A protein has these predicted regions:
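Low-complexity, acidic/Ser/Thr- and charged residue-rich accessory regions of DNA metabolism proteins
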Residues: 101, 137-196
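Conserved, well-folded catalytic cores of nucleic-acid-processing
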Residues: 78, 92, 104-105, 131-135, ...
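Structure-specific DNA junction-binding interface
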Residues: 1-77, 182-196
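Amphipathic, charged-and-aliphatic alpha-helical interface segments
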Residues: 58-63, 83-102, 123-136
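Amphipathic alpha-helical segments within well-ordered protein domains
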Residues: 72-76, 87-90, 107-111, 155-159, ...
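Conserved NTP-handling cores and scaffolds of large molecular machines
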Residues: 49, 79, 97, 132-136, ...
Length: 196
């Protein structure tokens, strides 16, 4: 029903934002990925939207890109994946990383996300793998596959050095995010060791 909302950012929280558009305040639920791309309050911005209509509520979801919105729609098309779970997935990984993990059949990466069990991860892979590889997402997928390989190599090395996988993942993800994924395996390991 709504393609996007273009207005002034009035309130900004990690899970939702309020945008003023022509004197009407819209509450849009956002992922951490979208939250991190937003400007300061009182700045003009545009969020692409998805409206979810239920018997007892109408909920607007906001996305910083059409790609993220399309991925959200694909995720909620999977049986057992609701809007909250899809938002959690988009908060845990960037759309590019999520697409790469689905395209590469990486169930372990999906299961690392809170609320995603083994069966749900497998269902997501089965239902979305072909859709993701055949869609416009493929350009980003190639670019992100390198980042996933760098991440996985660094994780493997840190685990071999004796760090727990959970702590290693936190450190690696923090460094990957701060470097926008543009980092070599060696530097990723070095920077992660400083945090661990």
């Amino acid at each position: 029903m709504y393609a996007y909302i273009d207005g002034i950012l009035v309130e900004k929280n990690p899970t939702f934002v309020v945008m003023d558009c022509q004197g009407i305040g819209y509450v849009l639920h956002v992922s951490l990925n979208t939250y991190s791309t937003l400007q300061q309050k009182q700045q003009r911005c545009r969020l692409f939207t998805h409206l979810q209509v239920k018997e007892d509520s109408h909920t607007l979801y906001g996305f910083s890109s059409k790609e993220e919105r399309e991925l959200f729609r694909l995720l909620i098309s999977v049986s057992g994946v609701g809007a909250s779970t899809a938002q959690m997935m988009l908060s845990a990984m960037s759309p590019s990383e999520l697409i790469a993990n689905i395209a590469n059949g990486n169930a372990a990466a999906l299961q690392a996300i809170k609320g995603i069990g083994g069966k749900t991860a497998q269902r997501i892979l089965i239902e979305l793998r072909d859709k993701v590889t055949k869609s416009d997402f493929t350009i980003t997928q190639f670019e992100q596959t390198n980042n996933s390989n760098v991440r996985n190599e660094a994780l493997g090395a840190l685990v071999l050095l004796g760090f727990s996988k959970q702590n290693a993942e936190k450190a690696v993800d923090k460094i990957m995010k701060s470097s926008n994924g543009d980092i070599s395996v060696e530097n990723l390991i070095k920077e992660s060791l400083k945090i661990l």
